[in-house]
């Protein structure tokens, strides 16, 4: 009995020591994080606490009883990105967490949001206001969402949409609370528009606003001009030849005025039983005022999935009548799908619901749980979905990935989507050979460049290099045109140069997933000696393109981002 008591005491002592060291390790990790973030004096730490009369109290530092706490670095001159990491507290209900989440982000990022709004409205609408037709459509859409929510209170899907609305309304309130200038007050519709960057490329023509707003004009006789404004990105998913590593990466194409960037980490402790939230941790490249990536590129920490898209622009006007306000916009559906899915098939099934027919993309969902180094890829490792108004198609494309890689470059893969989107019309004799060549899934320039180089990728450095690739002067596959490249540079075109092209690259791989880490770089590519982009060196662009808050010069390093740190590499 005495021996037993002594053993019990010893066990208690050992457990106490273990607990002490666990607490100390956590404390040391936390202090390390704070020290790393505090190396830059621009880092802000705030907590949001419940106040009186349903208001919030925002305090400096990290508080244990905070609804949400976060780290924020606003200086984009450091490495081309602002940085925001927010964590909510599961002691509070989902709605309270979500609204406070949005509120703190809106409050902290107020200046970036205003600059981003000014740039987008001036460049897209040539105005400071939302077009009336679009404003009316948004009113109908938001009313429809509220009706669905009221009529589906027990639905986890609509509970998720409710949380999205809570978050965006919270962001609106936080922004306006931080704002001290009445002329810079924003509305809920403004925040919707900031999240609808991709949706608007289809919605504006559907509302017949493309003729009024040059930014959205689509001349089917000059399809490359339309692609220059609507095409969004190159992507590559690559398994190494010995199956030791699986890489996922994405290069955004966009107007250079969008290069006011922010990397975000959301840790939203919503319930799994009420809202169906299965992935609470999400790190992604983004823009001020957006709840989504827009690029899109997400690392979902809890489900070990990477979600990527590139845009498939419609080259027909025959489908726009299918776009209606009684659906759910793409930006909302991707949030819900990210939270409610544990694999690619589930993600696709969630995303296809309430198809808005806007932001018609090819989505790639990589399930790293189905990748084991040095073993054959399991079925379901890669799902690919494509959307057009009125129709969505998806399937398991793991077999294609087993051959080495999957590449994506703004041309539809599925034949039904390709034909319905109008691409098959450009094989007729009344179009030039170059146009037909550019519209082909198999022979367009990026398809050939990927085919030429992807097989040689065997390291993270190789992967990064390919996604920044532009050697248009010497690579015959580029035909001496700077936009026929993985990372385009339309500003270098001798004919009609414009401030458009590859604006970033983000990559991750299996060995980085468990650390919730993405490596990224901001700005136009300098691959193969391409010149560094500087606004001051482009006088025409300076005068015609609003780029408020953007760095003047883009010569930034690769940066490693996680949910707790960012470091220049």
UniProtKB/Swiss-Prot annotation:
Protein EC: 3.1.1.-
Presence of keyword Hydrolase: yes
Pfam families: Phospholip_B
Keyword Transferase: no
Signal peptide start and end residues: 1-22
Keywords: Glycoprotein, Hydrolase, Lipid degradation, Lipid metabolism, Secreted, Signal
Main location: secreted
Compartmental location: Secreted
InterPro entries named among the record's database cross-references: PLipase_B-like
Disulfide pairings: none
GO cellular component entries: extracellular region
Record: glycosylation sites: 93, 126, 181, 425, 430
An example Gene Ontology biological process: phospholipid catabolic process
GO MF assignments: phospholipase activity
Highest taxon listed in the record's lineage: Eukaryota
Function: Probable phospholipase.
Family: Belongs to the phospholipase B-like family.
Protein name: Phospholipase B-like protein D
């Amino acid at each position: 009995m005495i021996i037993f008591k002594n053993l019990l005491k010893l066990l208690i002592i050992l457990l106490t020591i273990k607990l002490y060291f666990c607490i100390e390790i956590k404390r040391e990790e936390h202090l390390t994080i704070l020290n790393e973030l505090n190396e830059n004096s621009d880092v802000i730490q705030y907590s949001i606490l419940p106040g009186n009369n349903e208001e919030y109290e925002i305090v400096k530092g990290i508080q244990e009883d905070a609804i949400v706490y976060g780290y924020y670095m606003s200086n984009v001159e450091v490495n081309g990105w602002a940085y925001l990491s927010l964590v909510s507290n599961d002691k509070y209900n989902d709605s309270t967490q979500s609204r406070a989440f949005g509120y703190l982000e809106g409050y902290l990022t107020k200046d970036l949001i205003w600059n981003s709004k000014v740039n987008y409205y001036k460049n897209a609408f040539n105005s400071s206001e939302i077009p009336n037709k679009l404003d009316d459509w948004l009113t109908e859409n938001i009313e429809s969402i509220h009706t669905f929510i009221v009529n589906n209170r027990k639905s986890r899907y609509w509970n998720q949409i409710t949380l999205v609305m809570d978050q965006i309304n919270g962001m609106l309130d936080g922004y306006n609370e931080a704002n001290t200038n009445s002329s810079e007050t924003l509305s809920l519709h403004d925040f919707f528009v900031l999240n609808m960057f991709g949706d608007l490329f289809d919605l504006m023509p559907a509302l017949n606003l493309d003729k009024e707003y040059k930014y959205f004009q689509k001349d089917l006789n000059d399809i490359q001009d339309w692609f220059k404004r609507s095409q969004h990105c190159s992507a590559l998913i690559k398994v190494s030849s010995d199956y030791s590593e699986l890489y996922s990466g994405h290069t955004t194409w966009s107007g250079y005025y969008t290069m006011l960037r922010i990397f975000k980490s959301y840790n939203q402790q919503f319930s799994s039983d009420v809202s169906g939230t299965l992935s609470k941790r999400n790190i992604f490249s983004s823009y001020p005022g957006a709840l989504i990536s827009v690029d899109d590129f997400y690392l979902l920490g809890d489900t070990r999935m990477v979600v990527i898209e590139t845009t498939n622009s419609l080259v027909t006007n025959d489908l726009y009548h299918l776009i209606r306000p009684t659906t759910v916009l793409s930006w909302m559906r991707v949030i819900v799908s990210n939270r409610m899915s544990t694999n690619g098939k589930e993600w696709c099934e969630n995303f296809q619901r309430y198809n808005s027919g806007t932001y018609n993309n090819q989505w790639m969902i990589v399930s790293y749980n189905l990748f084991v180094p040095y073993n054959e890829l399991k079925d379901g490792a890669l799902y690919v979905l494509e959307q057009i108004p009125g129709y969505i198609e998806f399937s398991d494309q793991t077999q294609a990935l087993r051959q080495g890689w999957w590449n994506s470059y703004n041309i539809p893969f599925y034949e039904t989507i390709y034909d319905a989107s109008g691409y098959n019309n450009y094989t007729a004799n009344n179009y030039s050979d170059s146009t037909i060549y550019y519209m082909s899934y198999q022979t367009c320039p990026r398809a050939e460049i990927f085919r030429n180089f992807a097989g040689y990728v065997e390291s993270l450095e190789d992967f990064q290099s390919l996604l920044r690739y532009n050697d248009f002067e010497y690579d015959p596959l580029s035909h001496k045109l700077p936009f026929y490249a993985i990372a385009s540079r339309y500003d270098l075109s001798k004919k009609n140069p414009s401030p458009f092209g590859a604006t970033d690259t983000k990559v991750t791989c299996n060995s980085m997933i468990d650390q919730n880490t993405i490596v990224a770089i901001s700005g136009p590519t300098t691959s193969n000696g391409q010149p560094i982009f500087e606004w001051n060196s482009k006088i025409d662009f300076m005068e015609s393109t609003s780029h408020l808050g953007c760095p003047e010069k883009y010569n930034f390093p690769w940066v490693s981002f996680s949910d707790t740190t960012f470091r220049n590499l």
